[in-house]
Amino acid sequence: MASRGVNKVILVGNVGQDPEVRYMPNGGAVANLTLATSETWRDKQTGESKEKTEWHRVVLFGKLAEITGEFVKKGSQIYIEGALQTRKWTDQAGVEKYTTEVVVNVGGTMQMLGGRQGGNDNQNNNAGSNQGWGQPQQPQPNNNQTPAQQLNQRSQGQNQPQGHGNSSQPIDFNDDIPFAGLGASFGKHTIHAIC
């Protein structure tokens, strides 16, 4: 099968602080952020609910880095697909150190999910939608339609099929994350790196 192995990391968590975006000499963007994932369990002896939070360093490159810097804020819930990499660096005292990071490059994914956006639970989650991408905007219904009815209404208003070619415009998917088969729906704000 995979004689060389597989290096794939999938994380769903909350951003710990606003992403830091900088630019390399060649003009390519790099975004750094920390992502918190938590697990909870009940202690068998005490019956207490316990929680453990793990912090992950995430580095995004290129267009994904630019979009992350623009739309992702502290508290945002995001889905990340990338690869685990360890790099060596030297601190100011001349001591060699190692850092392990999740790197999201070409072929990686960053998807904005529902939940907290910049610490404001009432803020609308349109940050990763098609705004600013040159695609026509559909009016957002303000009635009590179900998401399926809203999707059907939107798809009837689209006259042109979307292709999968080498386009700079995003493809408007409304897919759930495959492992979320327990009724969880994560929205449609997906950004893929395509070169």
From Swiss-Prot:
Feature: DNA-binding region: 55-61
GO BP terms: DNA replication
InterPro entries: NA-bd_OB-fold, Primosome_PriB/ssb, ssDNA-bd
Domain of life: Bacteria
Segments of skewed composition (Low complexity): 119-163
UniProt-recorded Gene Ontology molecular function terms: single-stranded DNA binding
Region (Disordered), start-end ranges: 111-176
Known partners and oligomeric status: Homotetramer.
Protein name as annotated: Single-stranded DNA-binding protein
